[in-house]
Protein backbone atom coordinates (compact mmCIF):
# COMPACT_ATOMS: atom_id res chain seq x y z
CA UNK A 1 0.00 0.00 0.00
CA UNK A 2 2.80 2.41 0.92
CA UNK A 3 4.57 1.58 -2.33
CA UNK A 4 1.48 2.53 -4.34
CA UNK A 5 1.19 5.90 -2.58
CA UNK A 6 4.85 6.60 -3.26
CA UNK A 7 4.46 5.76 -6.92
CA UNK A 8 1.33 7.93 -7.17
CA UNK A 9 3.14 10.90 -5.57
CA UNK A 10 6.10 10.36 -7.90
CA UNK A 11 3.89 10.41 -11.01
CA UNK A 12 1.99 13.43 -9.73
CA UNK A 13 5.26 15.33 -9.34
CA UNK A 14 6.25 14.35 -12.87
CA UNK A 15 2.97 15.79 -14.14
CA UNK A 16 3.05 19.04 -12.17
CA UNK A 17 6.70 20.12 -12.37
CA UNK A 18 6.91 20.84 -16.14
CA UNK A 19 3.93 23.24 -16.07
CA UNK A 20 6.06 26.01 -14.57
CA UNK A 21 8.75 25.71 -17.25
CA UNK A 22 6.13 25.53 -20.02
CA UNK A 23 4.52 28.74 -18.72
CA UNK A 24 7.89 30.53 -18.66
CA UNK A 25 8.65 29.39 -22.19
CA UNK A 26 5.30 30.68 -23.46
CA UNK A 27 5.91 34.06 -21.79
CA UNK A 28 9.36 34.28 -23.40
CA UNK A 29 7.87 33.53 -26.83
CA UNK A 30 5.21 36.23 -26.37
CA UNK A 31 7.86 38.78 -25.35
CA UNK A 32 9.94 37.81 -28.38
CA UNK A 33 6.97 38.33 -30.71
CA UNK A 34 6.24 41.70 -29.08
CA UNK A 35 9.84 42.83 -29.60
CA UNK A 36 9.80 41.70 -33.23
CA UNK A 37 6.59 43.57 -33.99
CA UNK A 38 7.32 46.09 -36.72
CA UNK A 39 5.53 49.31 -37.50
CA UNK A 40 3.73 49.52 -40.84
CA UNK A 41 5.48 51.51 -43.54
CA UNK A 42 4.36 54.93 -44.68
CA UNK A 43 3.10 54.79 -48.29
CA UNK A 44 5.67 56.36 -50.63
CA UNK A 45 3.19 58.90 -52.00
CA UNK A 46 3.13 60.70 -48.64
CA UNK A 47 6.90 61.01 -48.05
CA UNK A 48 7.92 64.67 -48.28
CA UNK A 49 4.37 65.79 -49.07
CA UNK A 50 2.04 68.34 -47.52
CA UNK A 51 -1.20 66.69 -46.47
CA UNK A 52 -4.51 67.84 -45.08
CA UNK A 53 -5.62 67.37 -41.47
CA UNK A 54 -7.61 64.20 -42.13
CA UNK A 55 -4.74 62.49 -43.95
CA UNK A 56 -2.31 63.65 -41.24
CA UNK A 57 -4.50 62.11 -38.54
CA UNK A 58 -4.68 58.85 -40.51
CA UNK A 59 -0.89 58.67 -40.89
CA UNK A 60 -0.26 59.48 -37.23
CA UNK A 61 -2.69 56.72 -36.22
CA UNK A 62 -0.99 54.32 -38.66
CA UNK A 63 2.69 54.80 -37.80
CA UNK A 64 2.96 57.45 -35.07
CA UNK A 65 3.85 61.13 -35.00
CA UNK A 66 7.61 60.58 -34.80
CA UNK A 67 7.67 58.48 -37.99
CA UNK A 68 5.48 61.00 -39.82
CA UNK A 69 7.78 63.87 -38.82
CA UNK A 70 10.87 61.85 -39.77
CA UNK A 71 9.38 61.27 -43.25
CA UNK A 72 9.15 65.08 -43.69
CA UNK A 73 5.37 65.05 -44.03
CA UNK A 74 3.92 68.48 -43.34
CA UNK A 75 0.38 69.20 -42.23
CA UNK A 76 -1.62 71.93 -43.95
CA UNK A 77 -4.26 73.91 -42.11
CA UNK A 78 -6.87 72.71 -44.60
CA UNK A 79 -7.16 70.35 -47.55
CA UNK A 80 -6.42 73.29 -49.89
CA UNK A 81 -2.67 72.94 -50.59
CA UNK A 82 -0.21 71.89 -53.29
CA UNK A 83 0.09 68.30 -54.46
CA UNK A 84 2.07 66.19 -56.96
CA UNK A 85 5.38 67.80 -55.98
CA UNK A 86 4.08 71.38 -56.44
CA UNK A 87 2.81 70.53 -59.94
CA UNK A 88 -0.83 70.56 -58.84
CA UNK A 89 -3.23 72.02 -56.31
CA UNK A 90 -5.84 70.39 -54.07
CA UNK A 91 -9.28 71.76 -54.89
CA UNK A 92 -12.87 70.69 -54.44
CA UNK A 93 -13.46 71.15 -58.19
CA UNK A 94 -10.85 71.45 -60.96
CA UNK A 95 -10.81 74.28 -63.48
CA UNK A 96 -11.50 73.60 -67.17
CA UNK A 97 -7.80 73.65 -68.08
CA UNK A 98 -6.97 71.09 -65.37
CA UNK A 99 -7.51 67.38 -64.90
CA UNK A 100 -7.89 65.25 -61.76
CA UNK A 101 -4.73 63.32 -60.95
CA UNK A 102 -6.16 60.29 -59.14
CA UNK A 103 -2.73 59.06 -58.02
CA UNK A 104 -1.92 62.19 -56.03
CA UNK A 105 -5.48 62.88 -54.88
CA UNK A 106 -4.79 60.67 -51.87
CA UNK A 107 -2.80 63.49 -50.24
CA UNK A 108 -5.68 65.95 -50.70
CA UNK A 109 -8.09 64.37 -48.23
CA UNK A 110 -11.61 65.22 -49.37
CA UNK A 111 -10.38 67.32 -52.34
CA UNK A 112 -8.91 66.36 -55.72
CA UNK A 113 -5.38 66.95 -56.99
CA UNK A 114 -5.89 69.24 -60.00
CA UNK A 115 -3.02 69.47 -62.50
CA UNK A 116 -2.64 71.50 -65.68
CA UNK A 117 -3.14 69.67 -68.96
UniProtKB/Swiss-Prot annotation:
Q: Which family does it belong to?
A: Belongs to the big defensin family.
Q: Name one GO cellular component term.
A: extracellular region
Q: What is the disulfide pattern of this chain?
A: 83-113, 90-108, 94-114
Top-level taxon of origin: Eukaryota
Q: How does it assemble?
A: Interacts with intracellular coagulation inhibitor 1/LICI-1.
Single GO biological process annotation from the record:
killing of cells of another organism
Source organism of the structure:
Tachypleus tridentatus
Classify the main location: secreted
Give the propeptide segment as residue ranges. Answer: 26-36
Record Pfam families = Defensin_big
Q: What is this protein called?
A: Big defensin
**Tissues expressed in:** Expressed in all tissues examined, including hemocytes, heart, hepatopancreas, stomach, intestine and skeletal muscle.
List localization entries.
Secreted
The positions making up the signal sequence are: 1-23
Amino acid sequence: MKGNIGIAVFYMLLLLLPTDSIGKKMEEEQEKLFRQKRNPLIPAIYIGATVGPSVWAYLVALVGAAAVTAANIRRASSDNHSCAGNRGWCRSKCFRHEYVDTYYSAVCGRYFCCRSR
